[in-house]
Every structure is written in structure tokens, then in C-alpha cells.
Amino acid sequence: FFEKESCWVRVDMTDAFCSQLRKKIMASAASLQIPLIDHAVFACSEGPRFESAAEVKMYQMLGADLVGTPVVPEIILAREAGMCYSAIAAIMNLGCGMVESVAHDDMTKYYRSCGAQEKVEKIVRETIRTFVDDRTCRCAGAALEGVAGRFPAWYLEETEP
């Protein structure tokens, strides 16, 4: 952002998700006895649409554990804004080429019938309930670490104490 003011930012996406927030989410899930997998590789495709069988196969070959359309660009915008960000990905379909067909209605019905929606809501509520802002992560400074050029005058005026 800030491109027309001779400043742009390239945020480091090495650790895109906040590890501290992820730990809090994992602790909340554990306290509720809701199993979660701590780490996975998410491949984002352009949506809203389902991936083709060839895309699913390609992402598998590249090492993806999950494929979907959410998370990007949200994670990038959160990094640029200096926000802690994490995601809970509920598996709702196996993907084209892994099952005979994929339909949005089937996916939505499964999400509700298997209890995923309620589980995600419980985890989010518990994370908020037990949240303490004790962050020592680098999320807040992510954008500042990637600055090239000069900040525009309006930005400096808005951020002065």
C-alpha cells in the first residue's frame, strides 16, 4: 500500500499466521476437548468456485494439506495492518477428483450436520473469553519491517503520539 505516495510495503509472509494466537486457539480447543491439527499447508485458489481435479492434484504434489478459497487476501491484509491473525479451517469437502462430485449445498449441509459450525464458534468464544493481550509476537511491526521508500506525510501525521 501507499504506492502513489512513493512508499510501498512488502510484508514477510514466512510466518504468516500469528504463532501466539494459534497457541491460544489450540489451548482453547484442548480445554473444550475439540481436536484440531496444529499445522497444515493451505493452498489458496481463486474463488468463489471449486478447484478442478487437476488443480487439487497439483496442490497435493506441491505439498498442500488443504485447498480452498478463503484466507487470502485476508492474511496478507492482516500482516500489512500489523494484526495478529490465525485461522480455523473446517474440512467440508474432499475436493474435485477425490470424490465423484462436489456441490455447495452438500458442503453446507455437512458443515452444519457434523457440528463443525458449533465447534468453531465454541473455540472462538473460549479464545476470546481467556484472551490476554500479552503479545510478544512480531505481527504489529510486520509492515514497518517491509517498508521501501518514504512514508507519506499524512501517515506520519496520523501515527505521531
Please report, for each region that a protein language model flagged, where it lies by residue.
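Glycine-rich phosphate- or other oxyanion-binding loops that anchor nucleotides, phosphorylated ligands
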Residues: 1-99, 107-114, 118, 124-132, ...
